[in-house]
Amino acid sequence: MKRNASGAQAVQIYRVGGSVRDELLGRAGSDRDWVVVGATPEMLIASGYRPVGRDFPVFLHPETHEEYALARTERKHGTGYRGFEFFASPEVTLLQDLERRDLTINAMARAEDGVLIDPFGGAADLRAGVLRHVSPAFAEDPLRVLRVARFAARFAFDVAPATESLLRTLVASGELATIAPERVWRELATGLMEPHPSRMLSVLRECGALVLWLPEVAALYGVPQRIRDHPEIDTGVHLSRALDYAAAKAFALPVRYGVLAHDLGKGATPRRAWPNHSGHEAQSVRLAERMSARLKVPQDCRDAGRLVARWHGVVHAVRALRPAAILDLLSAADALRRPERLDTLLEACECDALSLPGRGGDYAPARYLRDALAAAKGVDAAAVARKAKASAKPSGAADAIAKAVRAARLKALREWRKSNPGLGAKPGTPPPASRPRRRASGA
């Protein structure tokens, strides 16, 4: 599009939003977004831009395919994050467009000549590490509670006191209930994948939103654990450390969701039992399932939440297990068919164990279980099945095959343990309190 005068007003194009912010932070990778001031949709279409905006005029550049939006204002006319109407015209100024944005760090623009336009002090807030709202209209959009928490998780910035007050106002308004569960999950998932996911939980907790969206997680804060197992004592603090460990290791989203879910049952322990949490795994599974269903969590994360909640304690003590119990654990994780599920479980357990103060190094149970899986997979299950089928009655063939394959894998595990005596529990190490229950698959 030609950037010249149109009528009485010149058409001006500005780079805006995240790419300007990240440029000032010395970060690369943000998509570039543009605002066009002084133009009409017809002018952009005539210049080859393709309209893609459903609610307001947004166009794709004919060559770069970057998004160009007409400068616009917005007005609240209903409830929820969708209750807005937008107004775009050649008369809308850049200042008006920037004023509708959420945070000062996102309300900067770069002119075509390179000049930074920063009417709300975004650059200063970047230097200070502060998330600050642009205007009181910030409190009109409940989705901004999640956005602020997500930016806190990305940059580890503090929330300005006045902005935190507006977050509480949004929570008190009841409008958070208007956000669809799928959208809540999408924002939470993005926050979990940021470098400092604990900051997201902290911001949501401080403004009162955590108990609304993640009540199972909110219940963990202030719940004590045995100091010999958890020097940080507070279960919520431990969760925060484990999530940040997962981020530092760049673990995938299902792993991080498994970490989020692993100790949920401790929030349901009666106060009279503190700091002990006997049987919390079963409660954790129940609460993880409830949380996953409410947020409509995708299946891979839902499976991880259930798996880690149920088995993390057993994995930590795996070197004290007998071969039969090890095989039960591998079967519960469906590791023989889907080894990536075992990887998810082990990585989440690593976060649980090595995020503790003073811990570090390798997570020994992971190497142990992967070696055990290799030993079990070394069995030629097809050959064992053929032999069992040949000697079994037709009506009982399936059961005979299952028993024969299990027996062969148990033999392989016993031989593996016998040939690697140093892998087992040290003398005097007690067995885990409960033996894993046999399950065909899943957890």
Regions found by a protein language model. Name each.
Residues 1-443:
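Catalytic cores of the polymerase beta-like nucleotidyltransferase superfamily
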